[in-house]
Amino acid sequence: MATVSMRDMLKAGVHFGHQTRYWNPKMKPFIFGARNKVHIINLEKTVPMFNEALAELNKISARKGKILFVGTKRAASEAVKEAANSCDQFFVNHRWLGGMLTNWKTVRQSIKRLKDLETQSQDGTFEKLTKKEALMRTRELEKLENSLGGIKDMGGLPDALFVIDADHEHIAIKEANNLGIPVFAIVDTNSDPDGVDFVIPGNDDAIRAVSLYLGAVAATVREGRSQDLASQAEESFVEAE
């Protein structure tokens, strides 16, 4: 199973927190100290906590669970999309729309509209419209694709959230809490760990650190899914005998 070592984390700068004046006292147990007015995260805590989170995500994906990757900050946006796509999972990487989980019924209607517009753009419907109407629908399609493209094939609520930056994505975390969906999150020294089921104390800004987390999670999910496929194949083999 995918694991991450302390050396990997040091190289990626996972240990660099935020400036000391911005700290959240609830993160005190995970802080090693401060250097040049920047908090240093205790990687002796982070390494086992991250590997424990990976083990749990592996189990969820082995049970065919759906993982929703959430990271809407510009620095993380593209990496979040790539990681989710690389393991056939789902993502929100632009803006979290309030109610995305708690008001799933309405979201489902918007997804249906998105899929209808996609069909229209491909089957020649747009070409039959006036230029103005075609442009309006193209813009609507782009807007919906931006906000819902990463969850359009999710087919229901996710089984877990993997979040980059607990502070920035606090609305998503609150919605998941309300629905009892487990939250795995990167929590920096300025963030509140409450509401996060699997806290991973670490830098949430450095692109190398973000890429390290996402790469490890995607690899773990792929492994979990292949275990599931292997057990399915075994079952069908037994049935065939």
From Swiss-Prot:
This is Small ribosomal subunit protein uS2. SUPFAM superfamilies: Ribosomal protein S2. The gene is rpsB. One of its GO terms (cellular component) is cytosolic small ribosomal subunit. Coiled coil: none annotated. It comes from the Bacteria. The lineage of its organism: Bacteria, Pseudomonadati, Pseudomonadota, Gammaproteobacteria, Enterobacterales. Pfam families: Ribosomal_S2. GO terms for biological process: translation. Keywords: Ribonucleoprotein, Ribosomal protein. It comes from Salmonella typhimurium (strain LT2 / SGSC1412 / ATCC 700720). One of its GO terms (molecular function) is structural constituent of ribosome. Belongs to the universal ribosomal protein uS2 family.
